Amino acid sequence: MDHKGTDPGFMNPVAGFGVTFKAMFKKRLTEQYPEQQKTTAPRFHGRHQLNRHPDGLEKCVGCELCAWACPADAIYVEGADNTDEERYSPGERYGRVYQINYARCILCGLCIEACPTRALTMTNEFELADSSRANLIFTKEQLLAGLEEGMVDSPHAIYPGTDEQDYYRGLVTEAAPGTVQQVAHSKGEVVQEGDSTFGATEPASEEVIRR
């Protein structure tokens, strides 16, 4: 058969449709997100979480090692000293300010490896998109883990008869009976008078503050 007069590009469309027809019968990999959400892996690198001890005190000691380890400069930490009147962690210091900028964060997990107290871990939450850059800066209050049974919100006193090492040995499993939350003077809170005469959100009088 003489092929001299045949156009060499004649078979190109046929070859192209051949690829299309073969793909029509393959298993589809498209996921109907967000209508159908796929379960993430157990060790998925999602939004960060600041963890608590079993009694509710914070694990973060404000060492800033996570900020130094971050290759994207996305973490900002300010440490402060604990006092007996206002204690946030069992140790000497705590993280007074903790921010993560998710406009910069690459979710690499290097900050998790650098944390000496396991205060920082990563959750399975990945829906972090927002229309505002300011909303992508998560504060300590947004990152701090919620309270579970047996916990009292910080600040409060450490478990009587224990020290910081006992917390890391796992000897403290819940808040001591009668533990109450302390007044957060560093956050501008003031002592409140009784609810019988003042509301829970009304400022205390100068007479009460001077006591």
From Swiss-Prot:
[4Fe-4S] cluster 2 binds at C70, C105, C108, C111. It is a peripheral membrane protein. Pfam families: Fer4_7. Signal peptide: none annotated. Keywords: 4Fe-4S, Cell membrane, Iron, Iron-sulfur, Membrane, Metal-binding, NAD, Quinone, Repeat, Translocase, Ubiquinone. GO terms for biological process: aerobic respiration. GO terms for molecular function: 4 iron, 4 sulfur cluster binding; iron ion binding; NADH:ubiquinone reductase (non-electrogenic) activity; quinone binding. Its EC number is 7.1.1.-. It comes from the Bacteria. It is found in: Cell membrane. Residues 192-211 are annotated as: Disordered. GO terms for cellular component: plasma membrane. InterPro entries: 4Fe4S_Fe-S-bd (IPR017896), 4Fe4S_Fe_S_CS (IPR017900), NADH_quinone_OxRdtase_chainI (IPR010226). It catalyses: a quinone + NADH + 5 H(+)(in) = a quinol + NAD(+) + 4 H(+)(out). NDH-1 is composed of 14 different subunits. Subunits NuoA, H, J, K, L, M, N constitute the membrane sector of the complex. This is NADH-quinone oxidoreductase subunit I 1. It comes from Streptomyces coelicolor (strain ATCC BAA-471 / A3(2) / M145). The gene is nuoI1.
